[in-house]
């Protein structure tokens, strides 16, 4: 959660911004809530319909299933052709990194919140950054202030983490936890240490 606060700050999300979040896993869901708290309009893209439904419950204004519609076209449609002021790439693939850059508006920012696995590279035309004046950032850590802020946002109910925890599994059933995650069943799986 604290690292998401750091990512939102690095992306300069402001009131009235159109924010695209690519990926609606646990981290994407936290970014949805933080962007809404900052006054942004939130668009989230993910191929898993059940996750998109949860994202709507947590405040996402619009959802995009990239298996059913073109993400870039839909973002442009939703933003009157501008693109997203801020993009958070919360999925670690080179494809989503390229998508984030393409979806950003002029003077937009793109935050690579997930490292790629396996490690990969993207071909990048510097003219895209130059002429669109895009700021590219990455985030993975947090400050002590971010940690304190995360606790306060959860304490005051501004960020709802219970919606994100989909399974609580005992240590004895830890193999079931891995299976649940591998099959994309639910969101955050917590292993309870009894």
Name what the model sees in each region:
Residues 44, 112, 136-138:
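Hydrophobic residues in well-ordered beta-strands that form the structural core
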Residues 98-102, 144-194:
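C-terminal hydrophobic helical "lid"/dimerization subdomain
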Residues 4, 19-21, 35, 42-44, ...:
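Hydrophobic packing within well-folded, soluble alpha/beta domains
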Residues 1-4, 72, 84, 97, ...:
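A general structural signal for well-ordered alpha-helical segments in protein cores
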Residues 1-69:
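Mid-domain Rossmann-like dinucleotide-binding core that forms the NAD(H)/NADP(H) cofactor-binding site
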């Amino acid at each position: 959660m604290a690292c998401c606060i750091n990512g939102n700050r690095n992306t300069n999300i402001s009131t009235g911004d159109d924010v695209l979040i690519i990926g609606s896993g646990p981290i994407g869901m936290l970014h949805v809530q933080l962007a809404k708290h900052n006054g942004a309009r939130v668009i989230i893209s993910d191929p898993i319909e059940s996750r998109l439904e949860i994202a709507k419950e947590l405040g996402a204004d619009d959802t995009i299933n990239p298996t059913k519609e073109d993400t870039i076209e839909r973002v442009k449609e939703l933003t009157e052709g501008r693109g997203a002021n801020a993009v958070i790439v919360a999925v670690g693939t080179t494809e989503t990194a390229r998508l984030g850059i393409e979806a950003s508006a002029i003077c937009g920012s793109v935050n690579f919140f997930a490292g790629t696995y396996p490690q990969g590279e993207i071909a990048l035309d510097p003219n895209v950054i130059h002429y669109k004046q895009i700021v590219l950032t990455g985030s993975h850590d947090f400050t002590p202030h971010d940690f304190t802020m995360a606790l306060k946002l959860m304490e005051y109910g501004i960020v709802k983490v219970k919606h994100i925890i989909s399974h609580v599994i005992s240590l004895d059933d830890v193999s079931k936890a891995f299976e649940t995650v591998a099959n994309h069943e639910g969101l955050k799986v917590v292993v309870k240490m009894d």
